[in-house]
Amino acid sequence: MRIALYPGTFDPITLGHQEIIERGSFLCDRLYIGVAVGHHKKTLFSLSERCELVNGVLADLTLHCPVEVVPYCGLLATLYQKLHANILIRGLRSAGDFEYERQLFYANQHLNAQIETVFLLPAPQYSFISSTLVRELAQLNGALDGLVHDIVKKKLRLNSGGQ
């Protein structure tokens, strides 16, 4: 059985993330979306809010295998092993992402040589979208169309005082 793990902070989940999830679901028999606590980042949404948003978005996606959201804290390599995953899915938008992901790849290999990483490039219309950009636009009351799902947009607007 091919079990994949697509980890991230998803603060918030974007249309780019959604596309990677849909395409990733073709590659496996079961897909886990690992939502990280995000100790290294100050998150806008709590872990439970981020899991709720991911689950809400999943309901509207065309998925080709069962998908489950799993919150996690700690090492990605530990979660990978716990879930019996054999594919780690990561998205690459730019050369900067590649360099960061290359370092993570080697760190994960150091922790667990069994980790196989598959990198997916987003469609061009999603290649510039980041959760950071979305949070900044929301904070400044910028347009979020074409960046996030409507439920995410609504949550961002509520979080920024309904502006």
UniProtKB/Swiss-Prot annotation:
Enzyme category, top tier: transferase
Cofactor: Mg(2+)
One GO CC annotation: cytoplasm
Origin superkingdom: Bacteria
Binding-site residues, ATP: 9-10, 17, 91-93, 101, 126-132
Keywords: ATP-binding, Coenzyme A biosynthesis, Cytoplasm, Magnesium, Nucleotide-binding, Nucleotidyltransferase, Transferase
Main location class: cytoplasm
EC number: 2.7.7.3
Membrane-spanning parts: none
Pathway membership, UniProt: Cofactor biosynthesis; coenzyme A biosynthesis; CoA from (R)-pantothenate: step 4/5
InterPro entries: Cyt_trans-like (IPR004821), PPAT (IPR001980), Rossmann-like_a/b/a_fold (IPR014729)
UniProt KW Transmembrane helix keyword: no
Reactions performed catalytically: (R)-4'-phosphopantetheine + ATP + H(+) = 3'-dephospho-CoA + diphosphate
GO BP term, pick one: coenzyme A biosynthetic process
Pfam families attached to this UniProt entry: CTP_transf_like
Localization: Cytoplasm
Family per record: Belongs to the bacterial CoaD family.
NCBIfam families: coaD_prev_kdtB, cyt_tran_rel
Assembly: Homohexamer.
Biological role: Reversibly transfers an adenylyl group from ATP to 4'-phosphopantetheine, yielding dephospho-CoA (dPCoA) and pyrophosphate.
Protein name (Swiss-Prot/TrEMBL): Phosphopantetheine adenylyltransferase
Native source species: Dichelobacter nodosus (strain VCS1703A)
